[in-house]
């Protein structure tokens, strides 16, 4: 079982938190376009649970091979793409048994292919 953080901010809850070189908080939702990331991103990034702040990913599972992700980068705001964010989203989705290890992550700036190897390495 993957530990989810007991955190709720408006319509977002139970994120998976990972560190893939920097901290990420990943929320799974039915439809990424319905989440007001411009408003919720800074609330999550600066939440007291994250003393070093956190990156935020809003993730929609399209299939076992595809995710759609929106990104709020700590210190930068909404960005069109984030490599470590795509890796964090892919790892979280696989840990929750929602996707395979080798998937495509669609971001506003384009699609990244992510492969999480059995040895723990993540290839982008």
What function would you assign to each model-found segment?
Residues 86-88:
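Conserved acetyl-CoA-binding loop-helix of GNAT-fold acetyltransferases
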């Amino acid at each position: 079982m993957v530990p989810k953080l007991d955190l709720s901010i408006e319509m977002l809850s139970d994120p998976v938190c990972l560190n893939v070189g920097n901290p990420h908080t990943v929320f799974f939702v039915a439809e990424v376009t319905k989440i007001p990331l411009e408003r919720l991103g800074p609330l999550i990034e600066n939440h007291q649970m994250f003393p070093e702040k956190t990156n935020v990913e809003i993730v929609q599972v399209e299939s076992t091979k595809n995710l759609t992700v929106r990104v709020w980068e700590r210190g930068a705001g909404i960005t069109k793409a984030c490599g470590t964010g795509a890796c964090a989203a892919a790892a979280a989705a696989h840990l929750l048994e929602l996707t395979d290890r080798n998937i495509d992550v669609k971001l506003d700036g384009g699609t990244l292919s992510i492969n999480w190897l059995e040895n723990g390495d993540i290839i982008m």
